[in-house]
Amino acid sequence: MPEASRSDDLDAMRQLAHTPGDSSSLRELRAEGKKTARERISQLLDKGSFVEVDSFVQHRAGDHNMHLHRPLGDGVVAGHGMIDGRRVVCFAQDYAVFSGTMGEMHAKKVAKVAEFAEKSQLPLIGIWDGDGQRVEEGVTSLGATGELLDILVACSGRIPMFSLVLGTVSGVSALAAGLSDFVILGSEHGRMFMRSPYMIPEIIDGTVDEDALGGAEQHASRSGVACMIADDEQDAFDITAEIPVSYTHLRAHETKTD
């Protein structure tokens, strides 16, 4: 039997990278009526326009048996593509991989495309669906997420930034999502918390539910974090596409030349 060629190996790795988490995580995702990161990017961008970066990156943590689970991509899909023929940079957290938590390589990957967007003066679109910091990676993860926040702050006022919150987002992910110019929360699944909702006493004892404390209506009417509420995921993508991209490109160019 002939040995597999290097191109066959590459195809196998690419197929593995395109597999979102394990089967149980994927079933849980489907049960909630949510889509995978790649499906969301496919819906957001023009067909066939997505160019992915760092699809084979893996975390390097060894504690807490993390060496036994090293999925390709480390729970985030990132790259650039087109919306109505205009170039944008985008990323999407994959809740089916480590619950979308942000580890060292996950954060570095997002930081890389954010820096590319700033240097290229392109809009940055983030699809957020993650449980914040990946505690298993400890201070290594903290350092990388700190660098990411620095880059996002540097992007503020330089390029248009969009955050689509399509799941329960907590901790550093919520903080990062809130730095955008346009924050769009999905009415069904979009929630934002500065700490895990499962650690909040009022939620634990049933005094309030997650939506009342961190849901889309709460952030649109009281906290002011949300600019718009989307009826569902497709509506969130449509809203993003309808925002005048030509205007945002013009403003980015003017900011660069000033």
Language model: regions and residue ranges:
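A generic structural signal for short coil/turn motifs at secondary-structure boundaries
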Residues: 98-102, 135-136
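Conserved small/polar residues in nucleotide/adenosyl-binding loops
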Residues: 248-257
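Short glycine-rich loop/turn motifs
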Residues: 74-78, 87, 122-123, 149-150, ...
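Glycine-rich phosphate- or other oxyanion-binding loops that anchor nucleotides, phosphorylated ligands
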Residues: 89, 102-106, 144-147
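N-terminal amphipathic, basic-rich helices that act as targeting or association modules
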Residues: 2-77, 82
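Glycine-rich anion/phosphate-binding loops
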Residues: 70-71, 100-112
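A structural preference for short, pocket-lining loop segments at secondary-structure junctions
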Residues: 80-94, 109-136
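Conserved catalytic cores of soluble enzyme domains
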Residues: 128-243
